[in-house]
Regions:
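Positively charged n-region of N-terminal signal peptides that target proteins for export
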Residues: 1-4
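Short, low-complexity S/T/E/D/G/P-rich linear segments that nucleate or cap local secondary structure
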Residues: 10-13
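C-terminal motif of bacterial Sec signal peptides marking the signal peptidase cleavage site
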Residues: 15-18
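Bacterial signal peptide processing site
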Residues: 20-22
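Short, flexible, surface-exposed loop segments at domain boundaries
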Residues: 25-28, 33, 81-84, 90-144, ...
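Mature extracytoplasmic domains of secretory-pathway proteins
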Residues: 29-91, 134-184
């Protein structure tokens, strides 16, 4: 009797695990759509990048309705990630949506997806690597576009994490031989430790990509 009971329990555990796996797969499949919004008949999709060239905080409109995240918005001023967010019409094919007090770039869904190309309005600068550690880089900014608000404050060394460094060896990200090299740094979020009297290096909140030139 005990033997049959153990067999029955094993079968039930197998079925439970199989059901959980199926449910997990279904939930994953249902969460396919990234954040999207429909404005003036066009659906825009979140690029994941912050627009650092916004100089006016006035919104052109507001997201008024929302649908489930598993759906695409079907009418104007509707999103699949919430309502109440302001938006600005930007350059052709792009709008900005104000999320957590930051203007996030959304791209026309019908535009060719250049997944490796970062929009020109995202904060970036050219720099020289002055020190390379195994998990970080120290750089000094050598060239910054005049249109960026932070040009006048990047006067100290800048510390960079390397999670998004485009430099690998044997399939692993590495900082080997990078001292003295030129890099292009794309970032977003807060710029910390900018005070001249602060001896700590400048710290960038979000590093989108570091490209070695």
């Amino acid at each position: 009797m005990k033997k049959y009971f153990l067999i029955l329990m094993a079968c039930l555990m197998f079925l439970f695990a199989a059901c959980n796996k199926t449910a997990s797969s279904e939930n994953k499949a249902e969460s396919n759509y990234p954040p999207m919004v429909k404005v003036n008949g066009t659906i825009y999709v979140d690029t994941g990048y912050e627009n650092a060239m916004v100089t006016c905080g006035t919104a052109d409109g507001q997201i008024k309705t929302t649908v489930d995240g598993r759906k695409m918005p079907s009418k104007d001023d509707e999103s699949n990630f919430g309502k109440g967010y302001g938006y600005q019409i930007w350059e052709k094919g792009y709008i900005n949506v104000q999320i957590d007090n930051r203007w996030i770039l959304f791209r026309d869904l019908d535009l060719k997806d250049e997944s490796r190309e970062i929009p020109e309005w995202v904060a970036h600068f050219t720099g020289k690597v002055i020190k390379a550690e195994s998990d970080s880089l120290m750089v000094e900014a050598t060239q910054i576009d005049d249109r960026f608000y932070f040009k006048e404050i990047m006067t100290k060394p800048i510390s960079l994490s390397i999670e998004n460094l485009d430099n690998s060896k044997d399939g692993k990200v590495t900082t080997e031989d990078l001292e003295g090299k030129t890099v292009e740094v794309y970032f977003g979020g807060e710029i910390k430790n900018i005070e001249p009297e602060n001896s700590d290096p400048i710290f960038l909140e979000n590093i989108y990509r570091i490209i070695v030139k």
